[in-house]
Amino acid sequence: MSVDHLISPFRDKQTLLVLSNAIKKLASKLEKKLVIMEVCGGHTHSIMKYGLLDLMPKNLEFAHGPGCPVCVMPRARLDEAYELASMKDSIVLSLGDMMRVPGSYGSLIQARGKGLDARFLYSPMQALEIAKENPHKKVIYIAIGFETTTPMSASVLLNAKKEKINNLFFHINHILVPPSVSAILEDKACQINALLAPSHVSVISGAQIYTPLVDRFKLPIIVSGFEPVDILESVLMLIKQALNKEAKLEIQYKRAVSFEGNTKAQELVNACMEVRENFEWRGLGNIKHSALKLKESFASYDAEKVFKACLSHKTSKENKACKCAEILKGIAKPLDCSLFATTCTPQNPIGSCMVSSEGACAAYYRYKRV
């Protein structure tokens, strides 16, 4: 059944033109440039796909943020996934782009080419079935994502415990949006003075998670939907706040996001996970309290603890010419990178921003090559 009739109002050209004109009219009254970070990679792709940059006035700029979980995953964690796949009688499972990102050993897809058992999942729940089908194998799920996907990992874990599936383990790489944004805003080089907050994350955690950012940094934050009309409406809301010298949290994406979020999903996560003291982010370094880990009561499912002796905890250097770090901080754009669309392409990605379908470089490569 087609859902075009539901989506089309949010892509209507006439509505976009009206919003664009309203943005330009109000933006002309701004006292200083408005630099908006769209935190989520989904927003970045919509902005590029629908040519929204071309509708913006010159005194309004988008800075692309760290809201792509694969992009910010450090090489050390990628190497651990490869090391787990290298163990005897192991099966490593992960979703989509995580399989394609190269660490210092290569990617999990390349591991498959060497005879290691690394598999794509379409749903985290498949991990339960694979573990049941392979009782004599060590099945390890590489769990990754922001607050959006964490409840699914929690559900799989809780079901594994309930069903007494003892050969399924979890390498937890679930990260949190607010601490990463806070780290960027603390940087003295940061020019960002407004935020488009992620919507899918907010469906789970609620808009409430951004309140501390508003209070601390005194900047407007709008939780925006992904469609072009959503984004332009959100930009208009940000401009109005800037003109009124306001700094508050507002929800544009009211058809899906509430202030409290999905409390049932939050309860699932809280039942088995807790905040880590530190976690390394690619391009951002170590950020305190920015990621989750399994609670001690689930230690027997924790791949980092069970297979500690097999993990090297090595670190490896990034390609010095790659500007992924600056792009993730909103300081640089993909077109500023000398590797972009030459050495670094989706077929031969050098940096994580090109590997992931949500990465800023992948979006520019697909929609805005010059």
Predicted regions and their residues:
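A conserved active-site cap/scaffold subdomain adjacent to cofactor or substrate pockets
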Residues: H171, Q191-S258
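Internal helical hairpin/lid segments
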Residues: E233-E326
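Metallocofactor- and cofactor-centric catalytic cores in central/energy metabolism, strongly enriched
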Residues: S2-H136, T150, A154, L158-E163, ...
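Short, conserved secondary-structure transition motifs
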Residues: H174-V181, G261-K264
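Internal active-site segments that recognize and position negatively charged phosphoryl groups
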Residues: I140-I142
